[in-house]
UniProtKB/Swiss-Prot annotation:
Keywords: Activator, Coiled coil, Cytoplasm, Host-virus interaction, Isopeptide bond, Methylation, Mitochondrion, Nucleus, Repressor, Transcription, Transcription regulation, Tumor suppressor, Ubl conjugation. Residues 61-94 are annotated as: interaction with SUMO. InterPro entries: GPS2 (IPR026094). GO terms for biological process: B cell differentiation; JNK cascade; negative regulation of B cell receptor signaling pathway; negative regulation of fat cell differentiation; negative regulation of inflammatory response; negative regulation of JNK cascade; negative regulation of protein K63-linked ubiquitination; negative regulation of toll-like receptor signaling pathway. Induction: Down-regulated in liposarcoma. Down-regulated in macrophages of patients with adipose tissue inflammation and type-2 diabetes. There is a cross-link at K45, K71 (Glycyl lysine isopeptide (Lys-Gly) (interchain with G-Cter in SUMO1)). This is G protein pathway suppressor 2. Residues 14-109 form a coiled coil.
Length: 327
């Protein structure tokens, strides 16, 4: 037979502790239920608000929607107009930049062409200046410079003398007459070598010789009857060898003036260099106002002692390549 087991009787302290524990558990459960209820209520409220908003949107009329569309279209048109204005401004700026660039390029082209034409004109003028004065054109070497042409084209006012380092004697004739000694059998011509000037060496080259305008060519001359004619073939012997001193310029100028007065030539008839081909009888080489060069025999053509002054000797030194001068 089963035995009956009796539980032990709880004490008062144990009973109070058990009661307190049960009450705390109940309170905790109640709080949890309250929190869950609050969350549910909040969700319900949010859902209700969404529903109300949706209902309000659905209740909006068609006119209100049209008004909103018109406002948005106006705003779009304003933005498009601003875009068009900005595009036009950009196009205008680009067009002005293109015009300015073309203008600068045109100015640069004009300046370049003007500079080219000026240089071409200067080059052509220099070439014509080098060719002028010789009928042969390109056959004559262009060694005649502008300074020599200026000296030959002007009168005795531009007669210049060069001071040379040499002997102290002055190579010049008397102011009245040149010193010539007649010699029928002499060989005084263009092929005669120049006389010797002593042991001193000349300090100048043939290109630096004294060139003064004279009315006489270096070979044959237009002779006029003189009281005491001399033959062309004569030895030219200076009384004293040497070079021009600075003081001999006055006597040289007097001799030139005296020679021009004796032969009938004026100072205005300054001579310019002429190419040797001008003596050939080719047509068109000599113009009508030019002086003809008469080739006369040595026995008949003569001139006075004043017809050729002393300073003509530098022209005789060009024996290999004589230069003729004409009006």
């Amino acid at each position: 037979m089963p035995a009956l087991l009796e539980r032990p009787k709880l004490s008062n302290a144990m009973a109070r502790a058990l009661h307190r524990h049960i009450m705390m558990e109940r309170e905790r459960k109640r709080q949890e239920e309250e929190e869950v209820d609050k969350m549910m209520e909040q969700k319900m409220k949010e859902e209700q608000e969404r529903r109300k908003k949706k209902e309000m949107e659905e209740r909006m009329s068609l006119e209100e929607t049209k008004e909103q569309i018109l406002k948005l279209e106006e705003k779009l048109l304003a933005l498009q107009e601003e875009k068009h204005q900005l595009f036009l401004q950009l196009k205008k700026v680009l067009h002005e930049e293109e015009k300015r660039r073309r203008k600068e390029q045109s100015d640069l082209t004009t300046l370049t062409s003007a500079a080219y034409q000026q240089s071409l004109t200067v080059h052509t003028g220099t070439h014509l200046l080098s060719m002028q004065g010789s009928p042969g054109g390109h056959n004559r070497p262009g060694t005649l410079m502008a300074a020599d042409r200026a000296k030959q084209m002007f009168g005795p006012q531009v007669l210049t003398t060069r001071h040379y380092v040499g002997s102290a004697a002055a190579f010049a004739g008397t102011p009245e007459h040149g010193q010539f000694q007649g010699s029928p059998g002499g060989a005084y011509g263009t092929a005669q070598p120049p006389p010797h000037y002593g042991p001193t060496q000349p300090a100048y080259s043939p290109s630096q010789q004294l060139r003064a305008p004279s009315a006489f060519p270096a070979v044959q001359y237009l002779s006029q009857p003189q009281p005491q004619p001399y033959a062309v073939h004569g030895h030219f012997q200076p009384t004293q060898t040497g070079f021009l001193q600075p003081g001999g310029a006055l006597s040289l100028q007097k001799q030139m003036e005296h020679a021009n007065q004796q032969t009938g030539f004026s100072d205005s008839s300054s001579l310019r260099p002429m190419h040797p081909q001008a003596l050939h009888p080719a047509p068109g080489l000599l113009a009508s106002p030019q002086l003809p060069v008469q080739m006369q025999p040595a026995g008949k053509s003569g001139f006075a002692a004043t017809s050729q002054p002393g300073p003509r000797l530098p022209f005789i030194q060009h024996s290999q390549n004589p230069r003729f001068y004409h009006k």
